[in-house]
């Protein structure tokens, strides 16, 4: 039976977002939402017929809020809004981000506080389910008043305007509709504003980054466990008793993950008089990785709220009361996604340091740069440089966007969130850190193969090693490989959900205790 996710504005989960955005799962408007949507629309129709002054319905926008609009111009006002606000720059957002944007906007609108017609929401839903993906430039949003520019680009194809992708082909908006068998629409009063005024773009990008960060946290524990086995690491820093007296949830979870991954390993040791402690990057994984786990768990809690929230303005209350407020302001998510970027950056930082320990013969007691006949062969020498480059780039990207603001719209919108910049930066940091972690896993597997004694790996690390080696080759000599290709294979392995799923079938991994 084909899976369909119901959208009621209340129960959308991050996992649902991933299913619809990346796996193409269909969705529908839940019957429970229809009455509220229709009631909200009737209130807007009454406002227009009664010539009441309501922002964005019978007035202009932004600093033009005191300019009255006649009833006969309320429809043209909405189309003008979309045409002029579609002012984005840069490369198009990827398909999964666009689908997440469409989904989250629909889920917000079905709560029934935006005064939009049910048929208009259904049109956006039809585009999503039929795979018509608007061309949305990645840059141009201040994160308040919502994501105006990118969301206006989302709306253009609904009107037969703009550009959209359909079955991988970039077409005019009208061509995409025609090929998908979809009729264009005209907007009614309030509808343009309802579609573009909200935190949807920054939330969608940040939600995808948050989901991927959760997976990366588990992969970083795996990478660290493999590195620990290379160094015959001391296991006492992961004993539960140590962490229950400082019961930070992420710290407890990391220690448990490492214990689970290393269960049965013959490549670990205990502290002795000659070797009392391991370096921080190995010994302090629970504290370092755990801090990022706690941060990202907090961010996920904010995402869970935001994807089920109304971020429109004005709000049409069920009793007919209209409130002009600021739910479109992205500050809560801007700060959250800045926090996300910092947390992911630290994962990349510590992983890069472990890569250095693996390739450094003085620290690993293995051949320099993890290759036979170093000198003739350079092995992983420049691979570590590349990781250092990504880690250093992350340190620049981790500077918070939310501490910046530029007044706009004749100083009416005088403090903005820069939340979309924060979300985009967090995703870039995520991609960089994921490459570093993939490199650590690749280097650790290479190091394990170079060790003179081939001891049994841990319960979880053995599964990971075996799967990894099916795709990524041992590097015998420089002349036989192009390491760039192997690095790309390594990244592809860890980005494939089946890799982590297989490890988690063998051992339990979590980000919270």
Curated annotation (Swiss-Prot):
Contains an active site 4-methylidene-imidazol-5-one (MIO), which is formed autocatalytically by cyclization and dehydration of residues Ala-Ser-Gly. One of its GO terms (biological process) is L-histidine catabolic process to glutamate and formamide. CDD domains: PAL-HAL (cd00332). GO terms for cellular component: cytoplasm. There is a cross-link at residues 144-146 (5-imidazolinone (Ala-Gly)). It holds the Pfam family Lyase_aromatic. One of its GO terms (molecular function) is histidine ammonia-lyase activity. Keywords: Cytoplasm, Histidine metabolism, Lyase. It catalyses: L-histidine = trans-urocanate + NH4(+). It is found in: Cytoplasm. It comes from the Bacteria. Belongs to the PAL/histidase family. This is Histidine ammonia-lyase. It comes from Streptococcus pyogenes serotype M18 (strain MGAS8232).
């Amino acid at each position: 039976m084909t899976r369909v996710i119901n959208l009621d504005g209340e129960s959308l989960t991050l996992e649902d977002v991933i299913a619809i955005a990346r796996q193409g799962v269909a969705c529908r408007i839940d019957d429970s939402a229809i009455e509220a949507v229709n009631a909200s629309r009737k209130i807007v129709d009454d406002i227009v017929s009664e010539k009441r002054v309501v922002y964005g319905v019978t007035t202009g926008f932004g600093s033009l809020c005191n300019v009255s609009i006649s009833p006969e111009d309320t429809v043209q006002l909405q189309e003008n809004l979309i045409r002029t606000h579609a002012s984005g720059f840069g490369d198009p957002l990827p398909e999964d981000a666009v689908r997440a944007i469409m989904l989250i906007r629909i889920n917000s609108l079905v709560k029934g506080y935006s005064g939009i017609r049910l048929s208009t929401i259904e049109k956006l839903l039809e585009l999503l389910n039929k795979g018509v993906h608007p061309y949305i430039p990645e840059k141009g949003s201040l994160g308040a008043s919502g994501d105006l520019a990118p969301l206006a680009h989302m709306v253009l194809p609904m009107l037969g305007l703009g550009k959209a992708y359909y079955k991988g082909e970039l077409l005019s908006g009208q061509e995409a509709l025609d090929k998908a068998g979809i009729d264009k629409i005209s907007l009614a009063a309030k509808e343009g504003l309802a579609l573009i005024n909200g935190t949807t773009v920054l939330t969608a990008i940040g939600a995808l980054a948050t989901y991927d960060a959760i997976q990366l946290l588990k992969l970083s524990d795996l990478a660290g466990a493999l590195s620990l086995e290379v160094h015959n690491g001391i296991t006492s820093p992961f004993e539960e008793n140590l962490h229950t007296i400082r019961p930070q949830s992420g710290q407890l979870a990391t220690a448990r993950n490492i214990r689970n991954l290393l269960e049965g390993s013959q490549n670990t040791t205990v502290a002795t008089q000659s070797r009392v402690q391991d370096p921080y990057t190995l010994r302090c994984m629970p504290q370092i990785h755990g801090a990022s786990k706690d941060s990202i768990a907090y961010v996920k809690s904010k995402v869970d709220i935001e994807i089920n929230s109304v971020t429109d303005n004005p709000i049409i209350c069920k009793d007919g009361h209209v409130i002009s407020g600021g739910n479109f302001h992205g500050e809560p998510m801007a700060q959250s996604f800045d926090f996300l970027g910092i947390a992911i950056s630290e994962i990349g930082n510590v992983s890069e340091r472990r890569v250095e320990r693996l390739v450094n013969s003085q620290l690993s007691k293995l051949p320099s740069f993890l290759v036979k006949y170093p000198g003739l062969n350079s092995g992983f020498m420049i691979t570590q440089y590349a990781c250092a480059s990504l880690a250093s780039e992350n340190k620049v990207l981790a500077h918070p966007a939310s501490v910046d603001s530029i007044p706009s719209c004749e100083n009416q919108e005088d403090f903005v969130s820069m939340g979309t910049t924060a979300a985009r930066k967090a995703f870039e940091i995520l991609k960089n850190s994921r490459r570093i972690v993939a490199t650590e896993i690749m280097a650790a597997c290479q190091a394990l193969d170079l060790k003179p004694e081939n001891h049994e790996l841990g319960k979880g690390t053995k599964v990971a090693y075996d799967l990894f080696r099916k795709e990524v080759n041992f590097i015998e000599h420089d002349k036989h490989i192009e390491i760039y290709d192997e690095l790309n294979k390594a990244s592809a392995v860890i980005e494939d959900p089946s890799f982590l799923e297989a490890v988690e079938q063998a051992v339990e991994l979590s980000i919270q205790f």
